[in-house]
Curated annotation (Swiss-Prot):
One of its GO terms (biological process) is 'de novo' UMP biosynthetic process. It catalyses: carbamoyl phosphate + L-aspartate = N-carbamoyl-L-aspartate + phosphate + H(+). L-aspartate binds at K87, R170, R224. GO terms for cellular component: cytosol. It holds the Pfam family OTCace. Heterododecamer (2C3:3R2) of six catalytic PyrB chains organized as two trimers (C3), and six regulatory PyrI chains organized as three dimers (R2). Its EC number is 2.1.3.2. This is Aspartate carbamoyltransferase catalytic subunit. The keyword Transferase applies. Catalyzes the condensation of carbamoyl phosphate and aspartate to form carbamoyl aspartate and inorganic phosphate, the committed step in the de novo pyrimidine nucleotide biosynthesis pathway. It is an enzyme of class 2 (transferase).
Length: 313
């Protein structure tokens, strides 16, 4: 029997240390399933998962789809580009239409912060936030935490440096919340133009120099420079950005010798990370992809099989 006090996964905010640990422990079990020759279970047989992505994301959508299918669920991917949304239907109209089909879980990605929470108020099934604007991306933070925990054996009392375009990154926000909750020491390293207001109040130490921010770090998490979200001139040029904030061998030297190098993907090679580092021995970027499927399996199974579904987050 699974006991989990939440009906939805809308963000890391609202999860306790115990909630996070439960999800990570279940994800560890899901890793074993994914590494078997026979990868499919029947735990969610007869249940329906709808992936509703208003933003294109091949990686995340594929990961959620595979997670649901490995648990035996019926999975439907709704292509928004070919849907009534293009004809003027609102987010709520779409949600109500899908709700009438009686799905068991909606996985939602949307460009507007709070979209998943809004849907959760309108539908009778569970909702999983697969990224909402610059707000949160909870399953990414969970998979990052699982990757770190499996490599380091713990999350507490480690130094994690999150570097790059923090301003536009929902990944950074969710990771800061989770890592602080689990007792890690979190740093953000970025030019002032790529840092949101109030970042220090979230529990992150702020650095503007890679040499200082990466010193003795256990984990270096690089963020994609999200040029498609930029309305102004946040960086002088891509070349200058890489010179000061791109991760290369020289900058990595100040971190611990066994520091992990992470990236949520997709990468801009030569912009925020050099290929020699992305493909190097300290990189766990491929492991992050593997852990993503396991974490999403754990989330689906926990939400849908919980015997104690409580208030919405």
């Amino acid at each position: 029997m699974i006991t989990f006090p939440h009906r939805h996964l809308l963000g890391i905010k609202g999860l306790t240390e115990q909630d996070i640990t439960l999800l990570l422990d279940r994800a560890d079990e899901a890793v074993k399933i994914s590494r078997q020759r026979e990868k499919k279970t029947s735990s969610l047989r007869g249940l329906t998962q709808i992936n509703l992505f208003f933003e294109a994301s091949t990686r995340t959508q594929s990961s959620f789809e595979l997670a649901g299918k490995r648990l035996g669920a019926d999975v439907m991917n709704m292509s928004v580009g070919n849907s009534s949304v293009k004809k003027g239907e609102t987010l709520i109209d779409t949600a109500m239409t899908l709700n009438a089909m009686h799905p068991d879980v909606l996985v939602v990605r949307h460009s507007s912060a709070g979209a998943a929470s809004l849907l959760a108020q309108k539908v009778s099934c569970s909702v999983v936030n697969a990224g909402d604007g610059q707000h949160e991306h909870p399953t990414q933070a969970l998979l990052d935490a699982l990757t770190i925990r499996r490599a380091k054996g713990k999350l507490s009392r480690i130094i994690v440096a999150i570097c790059g375009d923090v301003l536009h990154s929902r990944v950074a926000r969710s990771n800061i919340l989770l890592l602080n909750q689990m007792g890690a020491r979190v740093r953000v390293v970025a030019p002032a133009t790529l840092l949101p207001a109030g970042i220090a109040e979230m529990g992150a130490e702020v650095y503007h120099s890679m040499a200082e921010g990466l010193k003795d770090a256990d984990v270096v998490m690089m963020l994609r420079l999200q040029r498609e979200r930029m309305a102004g001139s946040f960086v002088p040029s891509v070349r200058e950005y890489f010179h000061y904030y791109g991760l290369d061998a020289e900058k990595l030297k100040v971190a611990k010798d066994d520091a992990l190098v992470m990236h949520p993907g997709p990468m801009n090679r030569g912009v925020e990370i050099a290929s020699e580092i992305a493909d190097g021995p300290q990189s766990v970027i491929e492991q992050q992809v593997e852990m993503g499927v396991a974490v999403r399996m754990a989330v689906m199974e926990t939400l849908l099989l919980s015997q104690n579904q409580g208030p919405r987050l």
